[in-house]
Amino acid sequence: MTIQYTFSMIKPDAIKRNKIGQVNTYLENAGLKIVAQKMKFLTKYEAECFYDEHRARPFFNSLVEYITSGAVVLQVLKGEDAIILNRTIMGATNPAEAEAGTIRKDLGESIEANSIHGSDSENSAKREIEFFFNKSEIIE
């Protein structure tokens, strides 16, 4: 097992329903340590840059509109095999298909409003963490 860092974003639907603490509890109970966390409103430009890999997909504009519709909580998580552990506790993208006990099954509302985003690879984690955080913001 390897100690890794990964990126997580609590999405506007969960923020609006006051679920930040509940999401953090899922993450911490899974063995992940929150080493950086901040709340902000993403600008359209930030959202477009962050989701640039999806720019050609038909859902891109609605994704940008959704993610800028309210505040998000940006996080850096640390733990053994943190990327896969975070992906596991998040659950499938579609809450209807996610396993019971996962964040998306228990808190998600739809494929888009599924409460949480998490890095899917080491490269994505590095890029996403560096997109939002300076090294000085990550507290071990």
Swiss-Prot record:
Compartment annotation: Cytoplasm
Family annotation (SMART domains): NDK
GO MF annotation, one: ATP binding
EC number(s) recorded for this UniProt protein: 2.7.4.6
Gene responsible for this protein: ndk
Complex and partners: Homotetramer.
Family matches, as HAMAP family: NDP_kinase
Active site: H117
UniProt name for this protein: Nucleoside diphosphate kinase
Residues that coordinate or bind ATP: K11, F59, R87, T93, R104, N114
GO CC, alphabetical: cytoplasm
Chain ranges passing through the membrane: none
GO biological process, one term: UTP biosynthetic process
Cofactor annotation: Mg(2+)
Pfam families on file: NDK
Known function: Major role in the synthesis of nucleoside triphosphates other than ATP. The ATP gamma phosphate is transferred to the NDP beta phosphate via a ping-pong mechanism, using a phosphorylated active-site intermediate.
Primary location class: cytoplasm
NCBIfam families found in the cross-reference section: PRK00668.1 (NF001908)
Gene3D superfamilies: Nucleoside diphosphate kinase-like domain (3.30.70.141)
